[in-house]
């Protein structure tokens, strides 16, 4: 399972941004090309792995959108996209997020108290965005049924678990000099 994801990661280009080695991948960056078969493989794995007894699928713009949309289409479960722009809709939840890459406000719409949600993300690095999102949704009376990210890099998943957030990931990677090393891949035997 996840052979295409594995192959695409080990063949992903790596660029330096300051002291940080950044891998370029279709799931995390949308370039060079996001193949439908890769989305299919990822979404099928998530359907087997995640608690799908939910009212909404939630993702933060931008790169969680392709995977979350695929899941929504396959299940008929509505999708709520956490946006970086304020809409001033009734019930809008505003939160401040800070990661190793950015700081800013995020806005949640289309989710109500009592809803059960699956949160889907492309990559967990620092875990900062997911930590703030989960806390804000829980404070609003929303039940987090599951949190799934396609790719895990760094300590963010462990930090989330230490904060009491059970997060599932499909692959764990690290960047070693100029290449991506896949350290762990989800198995349907787990």
Swiss-Prot record:
Any single Gene Ontology cellular-component annotation: cytoplasm
Superkingdom, natural source: Archaea
InterPro entries: HGPRTase-like, PRibTrfase_dom, PRTase-like, Pur/Pyrimidine_PRTase
Transmembrane residue ranges: none
Pfam families per UniProt: Pribosyltran
SUPFAM superfamilies: PRTase-like
Enzyme Commission number, as recorded: 2.4.2.8
GO biological process: IMP salvage; purine ribonucleoside salvage
Catalyzed reactions per annotation: IMP + diphosphate = hypoxanthine + 5-phospho-alpha-D-ribose 1-diphosphate; GMP + diphosphate = guanine + 5-phospho-alpha-D-ribose 1-diphosphate
CDD domains: PRTases_typeI
Coiled coil: none
Keywords: Cytoplasm, Glycosyltransferase, Purine salvage, Transferase
Location in or out of the cell: Cytoplasm
Any GO MF annotation of the entry: guanine phosphoribosyltransferase activity
Metabolic or biological pathway: Purine metabolism; IMP biosynthesis via salvage pathway; IMP from hypoxanthine: step 1/1
Keyword Cytoplasm: yes
Known role: Catalyzes a salvage reaction resulting in the formation of IMP that is energically less costly than de novo synthesis.
Subunit structure: Homodimer.
Alphabetized NCBIfam families for the sequence: HPT_Archaea (NF040646), PRK02304.1-4 (NF002635)
Family: Belongs to the purine/pyrimidine phosphoribosyltransferase family. Archaeal HPRT subfamily.
Name of the molecule in the record: Hypoxanthine/guanine phosphoribosyltransferase
Species this protein is from: Methanosalsum zhilinae (strain DSM 4017 / NBRC 107636 / OCM 62 / WeN5)
């Amino acid at each position: 399972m996840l052979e295409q994801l594995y192959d695409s990661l080990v063949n992903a280009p790596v660029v330096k941004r300051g002291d940080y080695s950044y891998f370029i991948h279709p799931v995390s960056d949308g370039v060079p090309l996001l193949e439908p078969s890769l989305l299919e493989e990822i979404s099928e794995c998530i359907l087997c792995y995640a608690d799908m007894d939910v009212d909404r699928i939630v993702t933060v713009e931008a790169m969680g959108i392709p995977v979350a949309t695929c899941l929504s289409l396959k299940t008929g479960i509505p999708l709520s996209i956490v946006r970086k722009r304020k809409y001033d809709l009734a019930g809008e939840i505003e939160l401040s997020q800070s990661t190793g890459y950015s700081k800013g406000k995020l806005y949640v719409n289309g989710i109500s108290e009592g809803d059960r949600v699956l949160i889907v993300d492309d990559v967990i690095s620092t875990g900062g965005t997911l930590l703030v999102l989960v806390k804000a949704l829980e404070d609003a009376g929303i039940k987090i049924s599951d949190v799934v990210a396609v790719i895990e890099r760094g300590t963010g998943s462990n930090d989330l678990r230490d904060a009491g957030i059970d997060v599932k990931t499909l692959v764990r990677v690290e960047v070693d000099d100029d290449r991506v090393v896949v350290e762990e891949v989800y198995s349907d035997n787990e």
